[in-house]
Amino acid sequence: PAAPEIYNDLGFTPHVDGEPFNTYRGLVMAGYQGWFGAPGDGCPHSDHSNTAWYHYRENDRFEPGVLRNSIDFWPDMSEYETQYTPGKFILPNGEKATVFSSYDESTVMLHFKWMKDYGLDGVFMQRFVGEVINNPDGKAHFNKVLASAMKASNQYQRAICVMYDL
């Protein structure tokens, strides 16, 4: 009988830091959306009350008591250079809670730094057709995030591939 096909065999040479990526074979990749936004981050989304807390809010609201805010857990903000305060959210220690904006280049740079620090080779930069077609604010947001990701991927030598969710 034919030999069974082997999956997940490490028959590849691991990537060497400082060398360009010539294949994705054997790399540890993640998906990266970069879809969070906040008032004051400079994105056109923040000019509109219903999209100011982009992707944090549910039904145009991001506030305590809303049953379905669209984050699963609060981010650890201790390493973020720029932080945004969404109103009345209070941490257990009594401090006002803060969040990040993916539109802010320093956020994307930090995420790519973490990828390098923790051995993640790179990302599939996920872009959503519905967010960029006939949507100038969405296109501006995601083009800025992509530009920041390209800069960060070069600085931290992480692989990057653009993929579209159709």
Outline where the language-model segments fall.
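Glycan-processing catalytic domains of CAZymes
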Residues: 1-166
